[in-house]
């Protein structure tokens, strides 16, 4: 469909926001890149206007075009690339030239499977950067840096993504350790998607006395731990107490923080798979509101984007968001026969608002599933899952399923592929670009059949975090070389921000080395090149988002998203490649992250 141009008012508002915002960077870990720790995320303060022509010169710019061209200069105007090549560049009033001095530049990274809306709704003053820390000292440094812009009495939080395996000590910080870094603000650290959690002294005092209509105080251990006690998950209860105290302005701040973190790791566009919806919302609308039992990955799926959309209307969003619609209703006996199942999905499919929006925010597909996956061994749930595929195909929407298979079985993938073939025979889906997420153990036969249906896959890259070597030596997947050799459009994703971090360089490191977070080989013989990994995260992911004509490569006419890196991703050691960070991120022709490294290199 034809994209709507943002209004002039919103463009001016966004440019002003980007121009006047400020970023504080905290460097840690020696050669580690700067990590942004802002309350009002934007770019490093600057006096120059962002509305003219922007020219990058003297770089190694990997365009990721069809020829894998590497050029030295690129010109950006009005949000698009207007010149890509070598030699002369635009000069004169309104032209800003940035001398890259040989730095590596790549297209903006596109994330094809994330749950970014969760990161954009975190209560408190959130520290997403804790996923980049490698030990407890670095976590504490990040918390202390964040405290500088947190008002008295307000929580500092760090949730999701982080697990003890990411830290050298293989544990979360204790109450005493958190107190040593932040003694005068309550702190709440929440592990993964469902806890446990850890707090400090002020947080302990709050949670042990907190009351609300649906829950009383939390049980907090002497070390600040919130775990499951007598069947009650007190990490989730604590999360509930924070969520119900969030204001709409708090949520807008959280959405800005999430976008700033995304820009700081080089992600310029996300395909959001939303969150696991409450299945009972149709029967009990009150269950959509925050509950003491809700984990981090559950929010009201009708209202979770409200704050982000408000920012977009104000012209203040700066990461491209594509929203999928995840529907999570299995067989519900109270709804009756099959014709009355799936009420939410049926309502969604009455409209044709897929791939609808503008360059910064648009809708996507049904995904990452239309109904919870079920096999024929559960007849009622299988019937509902199969019917959900029929409904999506009949309505002419794009559809996704997320199945990885296992090292010893690809039966679940076979069920998805054979069902897609049945949908094509009945309705015709070849022009809809249906997708398979994860796809770790898709066989050559599966891939050939999916390719014949004009489907694509998005390969998972998160196994490195919790995977351990198998006793039989089999790879944990994905089988990257096999998937890429099939010729099917194959993107790559991290699947943040609960079971894995948001940082894409971790996934690229895993795809190219097979090493887990502890340095163990868990995917033997299944490595791809760095060029292939970057292609999957840029050009291939653009195809997966149905945006290959606008995104994924640095070519004249495409939207101007690029990342200037702090090191040469292609030549540094594997260990250093994993630490890759941007020094400058550009979205829509505007600098949205600036580590300050290039400040002295501007002509």
Model-derived segments and spans:
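Signal peptide processing junction and immediate N-terminal pro/mature segment
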Residues: 33-45
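Extracellular/periplasmic ectodomains of large secreted or surface enzymes and adhesion receptors
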Residues: 595-603
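N-terminal secretory signal peptides
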Residues: 1-16, 38
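His/Asp/Glu-enriched, well-ordered alpha-helical/loop segment
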Residues: 393-404, 408-434, 438-440, 444-455, ...
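N-terminal export leaders
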Residues: 13-30
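Acidic (Asp/Glu)-rich catalytic clusters
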Residues: 312, 349-361, 450-452
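Divalent metal-binding segments
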Residues: 46-57, 62, 66-345, 359-405, ...
């Amino acid at each position: 469909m034809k994209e709507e141009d943002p209004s002039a008012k919103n463009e001016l508002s966004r440019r002003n926001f980007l121009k006047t915002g400020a970023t504080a960077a905290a460097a840690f870990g020696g050669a580690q890149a700067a990590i942004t720790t802002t309350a009002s995320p934007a770019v490093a303060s600057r006096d120059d206007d962002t509305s003219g022509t922007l020219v990058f010169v003297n770089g190694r710019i990997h365009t990721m075009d069809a020829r894998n061209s590497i050029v030295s200069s690129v010109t950006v105007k009005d949000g698009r690339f207007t010149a890509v090549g070598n030699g002369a560049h635009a000069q004169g009033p309104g032209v800003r030239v940035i001398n890259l001095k040989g730095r590596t530049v790549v297209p903006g990274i596109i994330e094809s499977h994330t749950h970014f809306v969760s990161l954009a709704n975190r209560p408190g003053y959130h520290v997403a950067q804790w996923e980049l820390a490698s030990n407890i000292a670095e976590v504490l440094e990040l918390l202390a840096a964040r405290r500088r812009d947190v008002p008295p009495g307000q929580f500092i939080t760090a949730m999701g993504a982080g697990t003890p395996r990411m830290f050298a000590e293989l544990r979360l910080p204790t109450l005493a350790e958190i107190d040593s870094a932040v003694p005068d603000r309550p702190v709440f650290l929440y592990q993964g998607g469902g806890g446990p959690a850890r707090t400090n002294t002020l947080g302990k005092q709050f949670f042990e006395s907190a009351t609300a209509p649906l829950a009383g105080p939390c049980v907090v251990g002497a070390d600040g731990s919130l775990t499951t006690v007598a069947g009650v998950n007190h990490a989730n209860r604590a999360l509930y107490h924070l969520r119900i105290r969030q204001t709409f302005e708090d949520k807008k701040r959280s959405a800005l923080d999430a976008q700033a973190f995304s820009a700081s790791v080089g992600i310029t566009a996300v395909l959001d798979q939303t969150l696991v919806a409450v299945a009972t919302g149709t029967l009990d609308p009150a269950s959509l509101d925050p509950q003491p039992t809700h984990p981090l990955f559950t929010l009201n799926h009708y209202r979770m984007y409200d704050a982000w959309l408000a920012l977009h209307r104000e012209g203040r969003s700066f990461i491209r968001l594509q929203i999928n619609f995840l529907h999570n209703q299995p067989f519900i006996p109270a709804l009756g026969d099959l014709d009355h199942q799936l009420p939410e999905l049926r309502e969604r499919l009455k409209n044709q608002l897929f791939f609808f929006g503008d360059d910064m925010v648009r809708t996507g597909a049904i995904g990452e599933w239309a109904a919870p996956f079920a096999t024929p061994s559960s007849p009622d749930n299988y019937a509902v899952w199969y019917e959900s595929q029929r409904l999506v195909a009949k309505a002419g929407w794009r559809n996704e399923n997320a199945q990885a298979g296992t090292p010893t079985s690809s039966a679940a993938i076979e069920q998805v592929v054979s069902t897609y073939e049945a949908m094509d025979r009945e309705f015709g889906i070849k022009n809809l670009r249906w997708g398979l997420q994860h796809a770790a153990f898709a066989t050559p036969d599966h891939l050939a059949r999916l390719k014949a249906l004009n489907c694509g896959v998005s390969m998972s890259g998160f196994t490195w975090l919790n995977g351990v070597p198998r006793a039989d030596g089999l790879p944990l997947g994905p089988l990257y070389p096999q998937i890429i050799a099939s010729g099917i459009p194959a993107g790559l994703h991290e699947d943040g921000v609960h079971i894995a971090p948001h940082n894409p360089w971790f996934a690229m490191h895993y795809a190219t080395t097979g090493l887990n977070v502890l340095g163990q080989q868990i995917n033997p013989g299944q490595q791809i090149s760095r060029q292939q990994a970057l292609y999957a995260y840029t050009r291939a992911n653009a195809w997966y988002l149905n945006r290959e004509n606008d995104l994924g490569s640095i070519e004249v006419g495409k939207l101007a998203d690029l990342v200037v890196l702090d090191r040469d991703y292609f030549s540094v050691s594997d260990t250093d490649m994993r630490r890759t960070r941007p020094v400058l991120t550009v979205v829509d022709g505007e600098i949205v992250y600036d580590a300050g490294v290039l400040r002295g290199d501007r002509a």
